[in-house]
């Protein structure tokens, strides 16, 4: 099967794209509701409908990306989210402060946006490691998906980046992975003015074969 683009909006995005045993969802929001709790409930209800429409399972969610207007409010979302997902098969993922676009046909008060990567081939095993409410890493079809890691024990961005990468060294050894095989690395930093501090530890870690990725202020 080739790439399938479904529910394509004119001049916009596909609602979901299927490719290589994966489904990639566009981020969904629910600004018609006022509170973060109500928006989270509305988004997850919509995903229930979409999973049914496209024949997907919550137990096959591999990775979650959540952008929140204020990630300090994460607990309000997390309580609802962890009741919604399959508790035996939690995904990896990240939740960061990132201001979602503030206009839509149904309202301008967008407090969060949520997207998923979902496995589509039930014959392929999904392995989840270090499972608590979420999980540290998910392995599926030859790919590993890591939850975002932080290192707040030190003060500067450069020191924190070095600490995070050192932690990944430990995790790669634990899970039998190689940093040379990292395909994409996304970084979310508090202040883009300090972007230059990333280069030294990042280059020292990856050398001549760095991954693709993005660094954004979030």
Region spans (language model):
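N-terminal presequence-like segments and the immediate start of the first folded domain
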Residues: 1-63, 67-166, 170-183, 188-218
């Amino acid at each position: 099967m080739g790439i399938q683009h479904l529910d394509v909006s004119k001049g916009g995005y596909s609602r979901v794209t299927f490719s290589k045993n994966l489904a990639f969802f566009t981020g969904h929001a629910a600004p018609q509701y006022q509170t973060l709790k109500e928006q989270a409930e509305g988004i997850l209800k919509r995903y229930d409908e979409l999973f049914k429409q496209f024949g997907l399972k919550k137990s096959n969610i591999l990775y979650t990306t959540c952008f929140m207007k204020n990630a300090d409010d994460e607990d309000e979302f997390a309580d609802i989210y962890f009741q919604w997902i399959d508790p035996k098969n939690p995904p990896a993922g990240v939740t960061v402060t990132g201001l979602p676009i503030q206009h839509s046909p149904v309202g301008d008060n967008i407090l969060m946006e949520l997207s998923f990567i979902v496995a589509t081939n039930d014959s392929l095993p999904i392995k989840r490691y270090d499972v608590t409410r979420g999980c540290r890493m998910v392995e599926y079809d030859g790919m590993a998906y890591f939850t975002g890691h932080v290192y707040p024990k030190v003060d500067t961005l450069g020191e924190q980046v070095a600490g995070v990468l050192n932690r990944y060294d430990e995790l790669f050894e634990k899970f039998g992975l190689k940093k040379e095989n990292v395909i994409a690395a996304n970084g979310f930093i508090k202040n883009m003015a300090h972007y230059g501090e990333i280069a030294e530890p990042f280059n020292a870690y990856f050398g001549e074969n760095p991954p693709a990725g993005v660094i954004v202020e979030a």
